[in-house]
Amino acid sequence: MHDNIFLPDAFLAQVQETMPSHLSMDEFIAACKRPLRRSIRVNTLKNSVEEFKQRAAEKQWDLEPVPWCDTGFWITRPESDTVKLGSTAEHMAGLFYIQEASSMMPVTALLKDNDDIEMALDMASAPGSKTTQLAAGMKNQGALVANEFSSSRVKVLCSNIQRCGVSNVALTHFDGRVFGGWLPETFDSILLDAPCSGEGTIRKDPDAMHNWSPESVIEIGDTQRDLIESAFHALKPGGVMVYSTCTLNHEENQNICHHLVEQFGDAVTFKPLGDLFENAEKALTKEGFLHIYPQIFDSEGFFVAKIRKNSSTTPPEVKKRLGKFPFAPASNKEAQAIEAELKSTLQLAIPEDNEFWIRDKEVWAFPKRMKPLIGEMRYHRIGFKLAETHKKGYRWQHEAIMALATADNPTCAELTTEQAREWYMGRDVRPDFSGKGETIVTYKGAVIGLGKWVGNRIKNGLPRELVRDGNLF
């Protein structure tokens, strides 16, 4: 129990005033004091739910389905399992993502009746839980622009995208308010999981409310209004967007959505979410939004609204300042050479939805759907880095292997548990078998990296920033 949890009187008064009458204040406070249940989402870009369930059963992990996400589960592990969930082999291989259950709901809402997305935007995407969930829902097809304003969070976003084998994402690093003017009516689907006061996160962080004040809520609301306007301008007519927060007050939730109607009138339609999952009506507002108080589903507090854009809007005028784009498309000859080498050395091929772009000695695989947006905005990175050229051919990259390879590849080398630990510590390994050339390294049927045979050992190709120490699986 989080008995020492800090709940300001002004916050409790606000909840008392706005919480539906059928919900109990005592139950709300009791729920806030209960530790949050641990939850994960299976990454279907790497394994199916059934395959993951088998792995979990072997490890005696108990999985309870999250009602609003087909790939989400609350997880309970044996007390004897002392390895941190993030240090398990399954997590490091990208087979699952540690994600709070409520935060899976926005992407579920965005994908409902919307399974043919060509161009999507995740406007505030770090650390990457919803970006990777959306990419999996898109099956790595189309294009997904993942934006993050915070410099310190871009690195972890990039790391999670690579770990999960996402290949259709372009990363940007801007204040989300620029999208409406820079890329007007460009995206058919937009997720705006807005920065907020975090009132719903108190079960995870007992100190979450120490910096809370009614004044800070109003200030954050001003930013949210700007962001939702920008998102709506960036949305194509006929497109849908989801606005979500992990907070509970109306100022940052219902009022922000109503502001959109005040600004754009009949161009806005709220899409009711009462049938999103079984018992969703328990959290349904009169507008059709989902306002999740922590006691309803024993989860974090959350808010989700789905909005359709019915007609065109006039975007703000902007002056773009863009430097020269440093990449050029690979020529047909270059592309054929890259494909042939990738096939002959690693028995791999680039997905049809990607194409080669060159920067100096680097070869990248961009989502084809990104091509119309090149030159319209600056990008932190697009797609994934496939290789670096050298005198004898190509030096394939770890992130490309994580995006392209599967454990049934004929070049795979399967490691033992001890060898896999050594691998993640950045050391070369010496299996009791031999091979030649570059090899895809696997552990328990999951790809974990790329190595190269040197005599009877596999030279470790794990990027330095991924090297781990301590208590691993």
UniProtKB/Swiss-Prot annotation:
GO CC annotation terms, alphabetical: cytoplasm
Top EC category: transferase
UniProt EC number: 2.1.1.178
Domain of life, per lineage: Bacteria
Alphabetized SUPFAM superfamilies for the sequence: S-adenosyl-L-methionine-dependent methyltransferases
GO MF annotation terms: RNA binding; rRNA (cytosine-C5-)-methyltransferase activity
Chief location of this protein within or outside the cell: cytoplasm
Protein's cellular compartments: Cytoplasm
Catalysed reaction, written as an equation: cytidine(1407) in 16S rRNA + S-adenosyl-L-methionine = 5-methylcytidine(1407) in 16S rRNA + S-adenosyl-L-homocysteine + H(+)
Active site per database record: C246
Keyword Membrane annotated: no
Residues bound to S-adenosyl-L-methionine: A124, S125, A126, P127, G128, S129, K130, E148, D175, D193
GO biological-process terms attached to the record: rRNA base methylation
Keywords noted in UniProt: Cytoplasm, Methyltransferase, RNA-binding, rRNA processing, S-adenosyl-L-methionine, Transferase
UniProt cross-references to Pfam families, sorted A to Z: Methyltr_RsmB-F, Methyltr_RsmF_N, Methyltranf_PUA, YebU_pre-PUA_dom
Family matches, as PANTHER family: 28S RRNA (CYTOSINE(4447)-C(5))-METHYLTRANSFERASE-RELATED, NOP2 YEAST -RELATED NOL1/NOP2/FMU SUN DOMAIN-CONTAINING
NCBIfam families for the chain: nop2p, PRK11933.1
Similarity comment: Belongs to the class I-like SAM-binding methyltransferase superfamily. RsmB/NOP family.
Function: Specifically methylates the cytosine at position 1407 (m5C1407) of 16S rRNA.
Protein name: Ribosomal RNA small subunit methyltransferase F
Species assigned in the record: Aliivibrio fischeri (strain MJ11)
